[in-house]
Amino acid sequence: MSIAVLDRPMSRQDTPSASSVPSACDCMLEVRGVGKSFPGVVALDDVRLRVRRGTVHALMGENGAGKSTLMKIIAGVHAPDRGEIRLKGEPVVLHGPLDALNRGIAMIHQELNLMPYMTVAENIWIRREPRNRCGLVDHAELRRRTQALFARLAIDIDPEAEVRTLTVASRQMVEIAKAVSFDSEVLIMDEPTSALSDVEVHHLFRIIRQLREQGKGIVYITHKMDELFEIADEFSVFRDGKSIGTHAASDVTRDDIIRMMVGREITQMFPKADVPIGDVVLSVKNLCLHGVFRDVSFDLRAGEILGVAGLVGSGRSNVAEALFGVVPASSGEIRLDGERVSIRTPAQAMRYGMAFLTEDRKDTGCFLNLDLLANMEAAVLQRHYMTCGFVRRGALKQDCEAMSRTLRVKSPGLHEEIQNLSGGNQQKVLIGRWLLTHPRILILDEPTRGIDVGAKAEIHRLVSALAGEGVAVLMISSEMPEVLGMSDRIMVMHEGRVTGIVDRKDASQVRVMELASR
């Protein structure tokens, strides 16, 4: 299967005029001619960036464009191969993340780095704990400091709760509070809203505006255009490891940014084709999981894309996990082609032709220390490529390479560790893993979370093509344009129950939000 995206070379006339260059006195952070290479990949090539005091500077670019690599260099995680970093006009050499923190640079990573079995307060003040006269940790003072920090940021989380008990969104807020606690001059946020609800995003933006008013320089990596126009003063675009340009957010349009990011025009963001809808493949009736969701009923047909919408905590992901046997339902009925089945494990679900892309690629998707081949073959090795106890390595590698090309995975090759890839390319590998199983039913939980605009269009085109081949698709998404643009019908959930199923022709953002808040 091939993915077609109309490419048009970008000319200089497509690029908006650059914003004014910041003066030396208000430049908090400057990057000059930085380059960085990894085995087989040039991650950064002569990159330049300036961040002014009291501004939010957004970074935009496709996955693999070099944004996160540059931020890790600024935060002391990686050392540049060449180039220079300046803080307040003075050149610096960073000798690790702790050195960067001591110099006033804090970073909130895209993949959260909290200790799950430590409390919230312990995570925030780790290696900076207040101590009593005996040299022991003063837990009362630790709690007081955390409460004061949370009060300042309007965060409602118990300081003594273990991090492992928190939702992903709450963990993200703890990471943000931890970064703020260092009182850093430069704060780097890498996709900070990827797991947040709309309410939590607005809360985060209030915090960012507060920090901006205090004169902080904030670097904000995002793929979301709406966020750029709402919160950013300036933005820089990266493409293929190079800085394309810096502009005032008020000077450009959405189409300008897309052309700068991908170097081409994307003619159709949601290429949903009208395909014949077949017979019911999956029928769910009164499915329940005690304390999580109840009485969930719906049908899914061959060739149909059934979108699932709802606010964070509505139970959407839990239903997907129950269908795939990750956390089996406590009651209810699942039928495949009219036959009642019991799905208690993922292995059983796979035997019935089901595939499941989880929402958390780091914890439940990728084997981070293994290469692309191992990650892609994980679901098919024993079932499709074993003969008399021997693995048909040639056929396996050939199919994985073909899938990698189809999905346009950017990597040095199949033997590159997946942890070295950008989040978007990791997501493509996981999608490839499940497509190799040739599923009849494909469950996608946030398939384009953390994906750049070009890759989103490719994945949307792929999903539409799969539906055209008769695959039944259940697609969970928190992005309203994606749900409205890609779905034949939309099932809406609120507090663990289905509040309505809307046909494509009757669906609107207002209608879906009404059902999601019932």
Curated annotation (Swiss-Prot):
Catalytic activity: D-ribose(out) + ATP + H2O = D-ribose(in) + ADP + phosphate + H(+); D-galactose(out) + ATP + H2O = D-galactose(in) + ADP + phosphate + H(+)
Keyword annotations: ATP-binding, Cell inner membrane, Cell membrane, Membrane, Nucleotide-binding, Repeat, Sugar transport, Translocase, Transport
GO molecular function: ABC-type D-ribose transporter activity; ATP binding; ATP hydrolysis activity
Keyword Nucleotide-binding carried by entry: yes
Subcellular location: Cell inner membrane
Binding residue positions for ATP: 61-68
Any GO CC annotation of this UniProt entry: plasma membrane
Top EC group: translocase
SMART domains xref list: AAA (SM00382)
Protein name: Putative ribose/galactose/methyl galactoside import ATP-binding protein
Organism: Ralstonia nicotianae (strain ATCC BAA-1114 / GMI1000) (Ralstonia solanacearum)
